[in-house]
């Protein structure tokens, strides 16, 4: 019997790791990856950090350059897909080529959620999703330039830190009443706000841009009535899933390709993962996790499901953020207001714990990354703690 052909669409973390997972889990059939980017699949997290700060930054490839040929994976870079035929199981490129598949993994990622008021500035306005975006930003983030960043989420704050370290004068505008309100607990939000303010970043909360005038400098009028002058304007206010191909193929979408917990779409031969995917949970709610680890996890899950193998157990959600000299790692559930702190954030060394009826369900480490491994195990096992002991620095965590 002829072995099946699997096609992967996308050029990021989830796409590359799907290829790796399929080979690791024993798939020996024909495997193709189609990407509209000219680069080999590369790591996205460094784009807002080392790619802007290092003297001679290099893209960090997800897999070594020789891996693709050694593992007989056919790479098609810099190509654009015109359509997906679900009935014919055919992928058609804009250059007229067509390719047959038995199973398909879609990891087309996401674009920056548009902000038309700023998009009208054209090349004077920046977002950050790809390596070419980082290269453009690196050119304009020069010392003493005034930089306005719209959005105080993870990307916005990482960009604020990098721009400040490059000598720019940075102002961040945020519609909400706090920074990183979507994915950090209140005590970490307060720490980050103070950290950026101490570094010289001006953060304007509960505010938004109402009017823009493009001139020698960009003039931004805010809801508060204040007017800012900017040499560089950047925004990061969320994502818009690259799900057009899926929509045109009549797959179930909702600002993303809807998948089940096996990463399967409404078509049993089509799977999806990474930022483009949104999971329908058992209770019917839709949930998206935008992180490096989630892309890896979903790639492994989809590969197992495609091959009819047992699905790997999901670890607690985890992501990290590097801002200035700080490394913050977030694991587990970030919801809730009853957080306790071990250590002193003012010394830039602390761990915040999220206990629910004594059970550890989440944590954030500040420059304490070595503690993530035991914390992950505790969250997975549902370990209970005495809050007093957990915050006592005289007691080693590993002894608890």
Swiss-Prot record:
Query: Which cellular component terms (GO) are annotated to the entry?
Result: cytoplasm
Keywords of the record = Aromatic hydrocarbons catabolism, FAD, Flavoprotein, NAD, Oxidoreductase
Biological process per Gene Ontology, one example term: 3-phenylpropionate catabolic process
Chain segments annotated as transmembrane: none
Give the cofactors, semicolon-separated.
Answer: FAD
Q: According to the lineage, what is the superkingdom?
A: Bacteria
Q: What GO terms are given for molecular function?
A: 3-phenylpropionate dioxygenase activity; ferredoxin-NAD+ reductase activity; oxidoreductase activity, acting on NAD(P)H
Question: Would the keyword Thylakoid turn up in this protein's UniProt record?
Answer: no
The entry's FAD-binding residues are 5-36
Which Enzyme Commission numbers does its entry carry? 1.18.1.3
* Pathway per the UniProt entry: Aromatic compound metabolism; 3-phenylpropanoate degradation
Ligand binding (NAD(+)) = 146-174
Against Gene3D superfamilies, the record matches this protein to: 3.30.390.30, FAD/NAD(P)-binding domain (3.50.50.60)
Query: Which reaction equations make up its catalytic activity?
Result: 2 reduced [2Fe-2S]-[ferredoxin] + NAD(+) + H(+) = 2 oxidized [2Fe-2S]-[ferredoxin] + NADH
Q: Subunit structure of this entry?
A: This dioxygenase system consists of four proteins: the two subunits of the hydroxylase component (HcaE and HcaF), a ferredoxin (HcaC) and a ferredoxin reductase (HcaD).
Family named by the database record: Belongs to the bacterial ring-hydroxylating dioxygenase ferredoxin reductase family.
Extract the HAMAP family matched here.
Answer: HcaD
Q: What is this protein for, i.e. what is its function?
A: Part of the multicomponent 3-phenylpropionate dioxygenase, that converts 3-phenylpropionic acid (PP) and cinnamic acid (CI) into 3-phenylpropionate-dihydrodiol (PP-dihydrodiol) and cinnamic acid-dihydrodiol (CI-dihydrodiol), respectively.
Q: What is this protein called?
A: 3-phenylpropionate/cinnamic acid dioxygenase ferredoxin--NAD(+) reductase component
Its source organism is Escherichia coli O17:K52:H18 (strain UMN026 / ExPEC)
The organism that produces this protein has a lineage beginning with: Bacteria, Pseudomonadati, Pseudomonadota, Gammaproteobacteria, Enterobacterales
């Amino acid at each position: 019997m002829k072995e099946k052909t699997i096609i992967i669409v996308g050029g990021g973390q989830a796409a590359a790791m799907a290829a790796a997972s399929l080979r690791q889990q024993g798939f020996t059939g024909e495997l193709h990856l189609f990407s509209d980017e000219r680069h080999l699949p590369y790591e996205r997290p460094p784009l807002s950090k080392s790619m802007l700060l290092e003297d001679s930054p290099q893209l960090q490839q997800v897999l070594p350059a020789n891996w693709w040929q050694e593992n007989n994976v056919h790479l098609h870079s810099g190509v654009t897909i015109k359509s997906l035929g679900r009935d014919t199981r055919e992928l058609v490129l804009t250059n007229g080529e067509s390719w047959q598949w038995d199973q398909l993994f879609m990891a087309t990622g996401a674009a920056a959620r548009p902000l038309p008021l700023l998009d009208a500035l054209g090349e004077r306005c920046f977002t950050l999703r790809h390596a070419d975006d980082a290269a453009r930003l690196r050119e304009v983030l020069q010392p003493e330039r005034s930089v306005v960043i719209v959005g105080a989420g993870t990307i916005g704050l990482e960009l604020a830190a990098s721009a400040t370290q490059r000598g720019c004068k940075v102002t961040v505008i945020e519609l909400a009443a706090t920074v990183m309100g979507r994915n950090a607990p209140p005590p970490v939000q307060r720490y980050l706000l103070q950290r950026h303010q101490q570094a010289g970043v001006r953060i304007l909360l509960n505010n938004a841009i109402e009017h823009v005038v493009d001139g020698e400098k960009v003039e931004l009028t805010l809801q508060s009535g204040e007017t800012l002058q900017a040499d560089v304007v950047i925004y990061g206010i969320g994502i818009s899933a690259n799900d057009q191909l899926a929509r045109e193929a009549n797959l179930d979408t909702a600002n993303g390709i809807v998948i089940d917990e096996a990463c399967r779409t409404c078509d049993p031969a089509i799977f999806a993962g990474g930022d483009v995917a949104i999971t329908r949970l058992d209770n019917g709610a839709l949930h998206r996790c935008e992180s490096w680890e989630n892309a890896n996890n979903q790639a492994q899950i989809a590969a197992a499901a495609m091959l009819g193998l047992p699905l790997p157990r999901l670890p607690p959600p985890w992501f990290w953020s590097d801002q200035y000299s700080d490394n913050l790692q977030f694991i587990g559930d970030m919801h809730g207001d009853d957080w306790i702190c071990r250590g002193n954030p003012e010394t830039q060394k602390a761990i915040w714990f999220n206990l629910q009826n004594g059970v550890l369900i989440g944590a954030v480490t500040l420059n304490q990354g070595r503690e993530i491994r035991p914390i992950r195990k505790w969250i997975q096992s549902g370990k209970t703690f005495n809050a007093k002991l957990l915050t006592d620095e005289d007691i080693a965590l590993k002894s608890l």
